[in-house]
Amino acid sequence: NEVLKAAGTKWNFLNFFPGLVGGHCIGVDPYYLAFKSEELGYTPEMILAGRRINDSMPTFIVSQIVKQLMKQNKNSQNASALILGATFKENCPDLRNSKVVDVYKELDEFGFNVDIYDPEADPEVFVKEYGFEKLGKLTNKQYDVVILAVSHTCFKAINPKELLVEEGVVFDVKGFYQDPDFLYL
């Protein structure tokens, strides 16, 4: 965040944040370009490196969460996690190639009990595309971990700390809340 803030002093700086890159264009199209480039004898190292980094983000995010729980002497087995956001970008109902699903699957592999809440995503499409359900609404349930995966504007009305058990962990993927107590990329 400090690097992005400093870079923002340049008049023509575009402020892009690290996060979960999905969707049809950025998640897929670089492979078309790489394929054609390699057909013509050129290996686009930078494009492929970018895709490797983007594809590894779900694993990185979950590893940071598990490490934080371990520091607190907590086990991921049967820990509860809430993922806020399922779509591939904010304020959009599109679920295509969403990396949030990969975060869900990684958490599940570590033994977490995972809920997903996304008022923007169509629940029927979500079940059809990914085979599991999302929460229709938030309840009074408290979680060991809350992950803000997608920065929907409607999430500004949510205080993630109110969704946590004591000493719970919030991982704010996009730096949406700017809270010093949260984990960030």
Positions of the model-derived regions?
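Structural/interface elements that position substrates and couple domains in central-metabolism enzymes
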Residues: 1-185
